Amino acid sequence: MARLYDFYKDSVVPELMKQFGYKSIMQVPRIEKITVNMGVGEAVADKKVMEFAVGDLEKIAGQKPVVTTARKSIAGFKIRDDYPVGCKVTLRRERMYEFLDRLVTIALPRVRDFRGVSAKSFDGRGNYNMGVKEQIIFPEIEYDKIDALRGMNITITTSAKTDEEARALLAAFKFPFKG
């Protein structure tokens, strides 16, 4: 079992039950999935770029990403329908907790001038979005072997009904919020 999942069962659940007055442990919010998305607009000009992006995301997530394609043609961006424009990976269960553990304990502290993540990035339904400017903050990526710095979006989907519950859940996982 993942270290963070055991921590969730043993520490987070009782803490949140007491804080919000839940009657059952099934009412306690939990993290359902983490989606890591990497937009690769440069792939339109050079197909090799997509292979590098997929490789990087696979190393970071430990799972093979799905290549996302353009839904419709846009002449201004020189993209056609079904052109590869990015890749994403959806993590659940064990891999999700391992990724969250690495993100909070290793990757985020390696960001330059890091002061914490914004607490305003909740969507109103208990989900959290954050952006990472460069993939080299993850220890799995070797600095010498990358072709370009690429950012990514990380979406944490929770079963929380409100942003307040979701924030309490992530804070219990030692998520580094500002202030």
UniProtKB/Swiss-Prot annotation:
- Identify this protein by name: Large ribosomal subunit protein uL5
**Pfam families hit by this protein:** Ribosomal_L5, Ribosomal_L5_C
Assembly description: Part of the 50S ribosomal subunit; part of the 5S rRNA/L5/L18/L25 subcomplex. Contacts the 5S rRNA and the P site tRNA. Forms a bridge to the 30S subunit in the 70S ribosome.
Keyword check for Ribonucleoprotein, yes or no.
yes
Q: Which GO terms describe its molecular function?
A: rRNA binding; structural constituent of ribosome; tRNA binding
Briefly state the protein's biological role.
This is one of the proteins that bind and probably mediate the attachment of the 5S RNA into the large ribosomal subunit, where it forms part of the central protuberance. In the 70S ribosome it contacts protein S13 of the 30S subunit (bridge B1b), connecting the 2 subunits; this bridge is implicated in subunit movement. Contacts the P site tRNA; the 5S rRNA and some of its associated proteins might help stabilize positioning of ribosome-bound tRNAs.
Ranked from the top, the taxonomy reads: Bacteria, Pseudomonadati, Pseudomonadota, Betaproteobacteria, Neisseriales
Tell me its family.
Belongs to the universal ribosomal protein uL5 family.
**Domain of life, source organism:** Bacteria
Entry's Gene Ontology cellular component terms: ribonucleoprotein complex; ribosome
Q: Which UniProt keywords apply?
A: Ribonucleoprotein, Ribosomal protein, RNA-binding, rRNA-binding, tRNA-binding
Query: Per the UniProt entry, what is one GO biological process?
Result: translation
